[in-house]
Amino acid sequence: MAEKYNLVTIVVSPLIALMNDQVDQLRREHGISIAACINSSMSIEERRDVISQIHTGQKSLLYLAPELLLTTHLQSFLGGRQVGMVVIDEAHTVTSWGRDFRSDYWFLGDFLKRTSRDGLSFPVLCLTATAVYSGDNDVVNDTIRELGLGKTIIHLGNVKRSNISFDIQRHDPAQIVGRLDDAKLNLTLKRMKAYIASGEKVLAYFPYRSQVDQIYSLISSADHIKLRRYHGQIPSPERKMTERDYKEGTAMGLFCTKAFGMGVDVGDIKHVVHFAPTGTLSDYVQEIGRAARNTEIQGIAHIDYFPSDLRYVRSLNGISEMRQYQLREMLKKIC
């Protein structure tokens, strides 16, 4: 579309790490240089440079977070060019995140309707590997309704990962001496160090940024080469360096939140450890799916489970906040 018609494809992507990973892979592995992203990790100058390259036709595949797409006039990105397609990557987030975590996802349908009223016409492609189809939890048709897509073509594939097994260890809190959270941190750290000592790459998910920082503070400075941390509040240069070193194998273990998650393709991760149960089943499937992307590897999903761990799920579900204008729009939908 870009070469023949000078059209721009916009990809709505949920995570900075995912945007960076996909743009890098397109360039490095497929020789596609027209892709770029704009996100909060970039400086004003870097953003302006990407927008300039879109305007001049040097770039034609643009990755954006929904928050930026909904709060910026579309033509400021396009510079007179037209949209050829909108791709919503990890489309299950429209419903699973839009209602309780990142409410801007819930308003993508309104954005599509507005652009249609403005005379713009383009196909919408939704991609996900974790959406339930049919039944009580029908994410596929729920997403179609939320986006107002109308008549659609649905392609279903097999997403079962036979090369991931599960290691679930249930613990009795009565056997723990001291604070439970401290014991859980030590269990997780012990696992991480053991896997790294065996030369096996490992990823550990935590519900909160504070827990990532806390466990990172427990390791010595000498261990900072092999063990890294990743969450949304870490400065952009450090995040980018961590992404690169983890892919290349300089770093072998990563403490992270879901900011490093869905779609990120690091082929040689053998172990995915959960400090506690994640927010939703879709989130969990996405997170353990980081293991064994190379199908020749047998991946393992681990969790040291305590009955009180469900408090994290309840807490995460209550964290999200909606802006005033979103509350007004939501009331319009309901009424």
Label every model-predicted segment:
Residues D24, M42-M85, T93-R99:
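Conserved helix/coil segment N-terminal to the catalytic DExD/H
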Residues Y5-H30, A36-M42, E46, A65-L70, ...:
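Conserved Walker A/P-loop ATP-binding site and its immediately adjacent core
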Residues T152-D213:
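Conserved interdomain linker/interface between the two RecA-like ATPase lobes of SF2 helicase motors
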Residues L18-M19, L69-L70, T93-R102, Y133-G135, ...:
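Catalytic P-loop NTPase motifs of RecA-like helicase/translocase cores
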Residues A194-F260, V264-C335:
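C-terminal helicase lobe
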Residues L7-T9, Q58-L62, Q82-M85, G119-L125, ...:
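Loop/turn-to-beta-strand initiation segments
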Residues G31-M42, G150-L156, L203, A222-P237:
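Conserved RecA-like helicase motor-core motifs
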Residues G79-G80, G84-M85, H92-L156:
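Post-DEXD/H (motif II) to motif III coupling segment of the RecA-like Helicase ATP-binding lobe
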